[in-house]
Structure formats: structure tokens, C-alpha cells
């Protein structure tokens, strides 16, 4: 087996694992949202807006990933995918910093804080797996 073939196979196996993990995390998010509804946990407008922004960045990231999956390996560019991953990480960092301040101030309940934290961390993990898919395509595994 050639080195190039070996790199592609390793990339494909990595991609399969990352796509499966993305599905698993979305399932965990759905269970967290079910728990939020069942326990009547409410988010502040700021919490909702922050999560909406993260979902928006993820949607763009998924679009880039899906587009890259349709291309020949040699045509895949990782630039846009990394840019979106950096945006998502920056948003997570901003949310996390404010989240700790809000907990200290008692801006929302502990239940709300827990669900919110689980959601924004899960969304960031999805972003990690999305960038891993493109890295697998370009041989950066």
C-alpha cells in the first residue's frame, strides 16, 4: 500500500469516527433539551442568544464540511473550516467567562446554569469533530 493510500484510509477511518461522534453529541443535546423542558428550566434571553449564535456557527461549519466531503481530496481547503472553528472557540470562551460571572451574581438558577453549560460545551465539541473531518480529508490526522 502506498503512503498516499495509507494516509487516505487513515483519514477515512478518522472521518467515520468523527461523524459518528457528531451524531452522538447531537443525541446528547436532544436529551439535555428534553430534561430542560421536563424540569421547566428557563434560559435568559442572553443564554438563548448565545446558544443561537453557536448553532449558527455550527450550521456554517457543517455546510463547509459537507461541501468538502463532495470534493476530490486535492481540492479541499481547510482555511474556511479553521476560521469557523476559531469563531466557535472564541464564542465558547466568551460565553464561559460570562457564565461564571452570572453564576456568581445569581443571574439564573443552578439548574439553568448546568443545562446551559452542558449545551454550550457540547456545541463546541461538535465543532471540534467537524474540523477533524476536514483535517481527515486533507491528511492532517
What does each model-found stretch correspond to?
Residues 1-141:
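Cytosolic, long alpha-helical scaffolding segments
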Amino acid at each position: 500500500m502506498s503512503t498516499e493510500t495509507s494516509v487516505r484510509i487513515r483519514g477515512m477511518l478518522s472521518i467515520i469516527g468523527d461523524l459518528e461522534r457528531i451524531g452522538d453529541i447531537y443525541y446528547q443535546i436532544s436529551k439535555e433539551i428534553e430534561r430542560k423542558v421536563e424540569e421547566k428550566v428557563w434560559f435568559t434571553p442572553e443564554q438563548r442568544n448565545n446558544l443561537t449564535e453557536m448553532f449558527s456557527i455550527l450550521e456554517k461549519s457543517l455546510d463547509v464540511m459537507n461541501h468538502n466531503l463532495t470534493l476530490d481530496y486535492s481540492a479541499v481547503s481547510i482555511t474556511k473550516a479553521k476560521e469557523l472553528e476559531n469563531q466557535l472557540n472564541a464564542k465558547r470562551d466568551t460565553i464561559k467567562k460570562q457564565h461564571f460571572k452570572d453564576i456568581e451574581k445569581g443571574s439564573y438558577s443552578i439548574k439553568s446554569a448546568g443545562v446551559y453549560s452542558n449545551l454550550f460545551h457540547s456545541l463546541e465539541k461538535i465543532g471540534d469533530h467537524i474540523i477533524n473531518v476536514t483535517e481527515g480529508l486533507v491528511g492532517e490526522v
